Amino acid sequence: MSPSKYLLTPPEELHPLTDSNPQIYPDFDPWIHTKEEDKILKEFVAKGYYTASRVNFETISARSALQGSLPKVSSLLGDELSKIIEIREQEINRISTLDIEDSTRFTKWSGQDFHLPNRVTLTDQKRNLWLQELSSSNTSLRKLTKSVPHGFRKRHILEQCYTQFVPIYRVIWLIKSCYAIEWKGMISKAKGETTHEELLSTLYKDWTDNMVLILEKLVFEVSKYYNDPGQLKYWKLRIAHYLKILGNCYEMELLNRSTLHQWLVDFLSKIESFEFYPMTLHILSIFWSGILGTTEEDTEIESSFLIIKLSEILLRKYHIISESKCMINDSKYIINDVQRNSKLKESVLLRLRQFISHIFHTQSLEAFIMPKQNWNIYKNYLYQILLQNVSDEETPKLKKKLKLISYRNESLRLGSLDVEPSRETSPFSTELTLDNVFSGNILNLKNVSPELLGVLDSGLSGSEWSLFIDQKITKMEQVIEIILWAINPSRKHRYDSCHLVAKILVLKINSQESFQEYSIEDVIWSLIFHFSKLSKLELQKIVWLPKLHQLLNVFIGYGIIKVPTYIRRLISSGVLYLPESENKNFHCKLLINLKISPIMKSQYNMVLKNVMEYAPHFYEKYNFDKLVSIFESLKPKLLSGDFERLEEYPGSIRIMCSEWYLSQICFNQGELQKVNNHKIIKTFQLFCINLGELHHFFGWAEYIVYHQLIDDLENLEVFTDILLYLDKAFLLLINDHILFMKTLLHSYMRDLRIKDKAAFELINFKSFWKFFVKNCANMIEMDSSLQNQIAEVFELERHRKDHFTKMPNETVSLYLEITGNKNTKFEEQNFPSVIQQNIKKVLHNPEDESNCRKLLLLCKASHASEYNKFLSIFVKRGDFTVHELLKLISLKLLSFEVIQKTSHFDLLCELVSQVSFNYGLNFENEKNAFVKRNFKQITLQLFSRPTFRDTLVRMLVEYGPNSNLSEKSAQVVSHILREEKNMSIIRDMLIYGMNIENEAIDNTIDLYRYLNFTNTWLFQILTEFNVKNSNAEDLSDFFSSIVGAIGYNSLLPKIFSNISDKKQVSTLLTVIERQFLARVLETEKSALVFLHIMMDTEIVLSRHLVNMSSLGMDSEVLELFKNTIATFAKMPNDTLKKYDENLNELLKIVIIHEKFILRHCFESIELRDHYMVDNFYTLFHNTGKDLKLKLLLYDLLTSLKSYILNETKDQALHSIKMPSVLNQLPKFAISSFLDSEGTEDEFLDKDEPSLIRLGICDKQAKTNSALKYFVFNKKSSQFDCIFKIEPFQYLVNYQEPLEGELNNTSLSLGLFDARLEKTNPS
């Protein structure tokens, strides 16, 4: 007998003796007891303590205690019997309740009899108590399964299971039970009206939807616990447990896998905050193999679509994170931890790289087929991911795959024809020679980027430039394009062009895929030497020399180029030693206009000395010592404020003056001096007008703002007007916009506000605040305090609008404050007389100008309509000079709209032709804004007045290229051409800013000699005008004349882009196609250039026809096209290879006329004429490995096959037979172009991401748990249908069997002697 059964244990309530009691006999000392001791004495000592015996009497046998009871022995026998039955069923192939290879089971034996648990109705409290017992492993599952609470909702069950950490096997049992109960209920309700498959589909979908909903909620909860480590740890435990639940349901097929896959991909797509990326990617890795491993035939298309979608999403996320500067969003970090940020960013990018690489190496290449606009963005990233850390042996294979994908994404299909140069060889190209860039004339670029030119003319906000530069500026010839744009005479009004080009180059140098600095410098100096070789007339047409000098000096300031490098190249070129060379003059003029430092003195003087024999004045007037002497003589002049004729000095002297004067006014004045209106305007004129050093003005602007030297609101108004006038340069040249604006707003709201209440209430800065918010929105988002300041000023401006109309007392108090006369009653004042008197004082009494202006602004704010009426009368009277009106506009007392309403257009034309900075820059700002709003009306009024011809031309040239005004510009120029009936306006616009005599050009075609990428917009207008006014017969001659005048110019397609008339387009297409087909069999380089340009022109023209099905083909052209196709089809393979480029261009005609040609082929097939189809098929087989060509032909043949199938749906056309060549067309994929030795198998297991299976048993070889069984009909000896047991019908039975309750699956089949056999019924 075990002694443990009779081991005495002390009672729990008895307190043990402690060592603190003295170790003496208690009999010798009196007993001092406590109340507690009395209680112990009564309960235990008095009554005694004993343990009851296990048997009734000591005399009874102890056999039952020593040996196990009969029920226990019976239970053991039952377990062994169950094992015997299991073995017997498996051996003799009876219906098995357990499949040997089915590892999704949790127990070895479930029994044949199956009984759903009884459902009982419980209160919410008892239901939760039942779930708590389920989560406890101490509670027997057999006890719990006798009854299941009724009314559990799916979401409630799942939430309780992960919050209470119910063991996984119990969760699975509960989910299976709920599945089975719901399934049984659904069958009884359906009554045979709904199929079994539909019921199961609904059941699985409902549960899966709830599962993913909870998972989404759990992922988003992470943001709540960032600052609470305890809650964050608990959240991790909960989501880990839930993922184990979900993972087991996924493996056991207790959810709809395709729904989960679709949700996961969509969820990854929609998350934007970086804080959710790690967990989302972790979840994706868990189910990664499932998403990629779908192989069922019925879901193959769906899975393929999902993988394509997933690939694009992963590339998009990679692009977003790569471009992001900060991944951390934590309130604890005022300045983000750089190391932590970079580590997190690299970790996420690494996981994304693993996913993308795994898809690339294990899936079909079609996974990366995407819309062209997306491909242009993600292409570079895919190259970067896949070619990183790749051995030299694998690189060619990877590049071939990438080339295939690139060809497919860029293949020419209907609606996606592209006239841009192809870039499939490499994402970036930085090495070039000028011969590769120019074709003939220096501005005749072989490749022009219209998008780049449009952005340069129209502008982007500061934050958009980085993204645009990374994506769009990928070739070195684009650097030449933007330089030529900046120095072109037609862009000389762009004061910011030099700094804009410099910023683009600096951003490109610092970008991930950067150009090397030495490469850029080499291209710039090569371009300068190219300019020196041009004649004087050619140079005047393409370069405005002051802007070229300014651009190079800006480059020098940014460190993009270096003058010593230029001098060394100049000496080594030998130009200085040529007798009487114009090159020397060009280089010497350039050198004396560059920034020269004292350390370059000897080199600089040496160059000038070398030309003394032919041009001695360069050294005599501009040697370095002479430059310093002139600079020293100008210092007193600058300090006295005499800035006249400074612009006549060479650029080197102007730079010296600008740098010295900036240091003088900022650092050498001793005590800080406040600035006034006069000082601000004069400094602007000096730096921006006389010296042309914009960046020095903005350096001074930062200085006076940070030192708070503007102590008057009127001065601040003048200052902000200048910043608005230089809006583009403000975005480029202010170093820290946030700090600048915060300081400016602080001065405005805290200091200046209390100094002059009247000025604060009357002077409006709303236009400047709006400008900043519009162009610097991303900067405002980065700083919460700046957001609050901006919100505060906008709220103030909003209240100011109705301030005076709703509060007349405020008007009176301000009036008394301005006048300083407390006895004056505002109500007694005559409103018109107040305006009239103060206008006179403003115009003629400078000492009273400030107060009078405030009174007029008060009148305007309190009685706006009466004020404007009086000014309209004032303008109609004409008692003023233009200079006086200009001053009123500058002081914001008069608007252009008031003059416009009086129909005083002569006066309006006079004003818009004026340029004035004497009273600030508000006049220029108002004029520019007014012209943009009324561009068409103003230009037409200027046209009707010949005296303003120069103003008209200047306005058309300056505003015409702007995309927002392009349509109005076209209308105005077309109107002028119709009215004048000659080309004089075009001629004037073409030579604007060139400083050359107006050449007499009577022939329209001669004007096309001036065509270049900077004036393409003007020739688009001219071409559209001429085409509209030409008949069909003249169009052919007109097109041929243009081609003859400009040669094979890549701009030819662009000048026809505005033509949209259907008849004119069709006529031009016929003309182009005839010329194209006449030379398509020529292989000379010039012929290929001609074919390329002709086809690009046809593509541009065809885009204007929305309904391409109506775009027919001339019968003569069609026959010529068919004969040409037949000629190519008859060529041997070796010969055909020489014509790949010709054939590529030819097939674009098929795309343009696709529906027409498909219809023609179909009609030919009706007449049993397969000649053209056979020729296309022959070409498809003979083109070899020309991937792009093969894709085009395959697309054509598949389109033709689809067209025939669609047309023959009608019963009447069933007699038409599909051509045999189309039936033989193979199933085609882009991976078909891979060579046999470069198959995808080599990359099958490469870069597979480490997958985390939370709580899921890993298997050596995954088996499909959904085994296919078939019901066998013994009478017919055939398999009738597939039989499948659903996963939830494998529910473990823990209950006692009830009579009459039998499982409706396994045992029911057993009664009919059915068997589950894994045999193929076929």
Curated annotation (Swiss-Prot):
GO biological process, one term: regulation of transcription by RNA polymerase II
Chain intervals for the UniProt region annotation (Disordered): 1-21
Molecular function per GO: transcription coregulator activity
GO CC annotation terms, alphabetical: mediator complex
Principal location: nucleus
Cell location: Nucleus
InterPro entries: Mediator_Med12
Keyword vocabulary terms for this entry: Activator, Nucleus, Repressor, Transcription, Transcription regulation
Record carries keyword Disulfide bond: no
PANTHER family from the UniProt entry: MEDIATOR OF RNA POLYMERASE II TRANSCRIPTION SUBUNIT 12
Family recorded in the similarity comment: Belongs to the Mediator complex subunit 12 family.
Assembly and oligomerization: Component of the SRB8-11 complex, which itself associates with the Mediator complex.
Chain's role: Component of the SRB8-11 complex. The SRB8-11 complex is a regulatory module of the Mediator complex which is itself involved in regulation of basal and activated RNA polymerase II-dependent transcription. The SRB8-11 complex may be involved in the transcriptional repression of a subset of genes regulated by Mediator. It may inhibit the association of the Mediator complex with RNA polymerase II to form the holoenzyme complex.
Entry protein name: Mediator of RNA polymerase II transcription subunit 12
Organism, scientific name: Kluyveromyces lactis (strain ATCC 8585 / CBS 2359 / DSM 70799 / NBRC 1267 / NRRL Y-1140 / WM37)
Gene behind the chain: SRB8
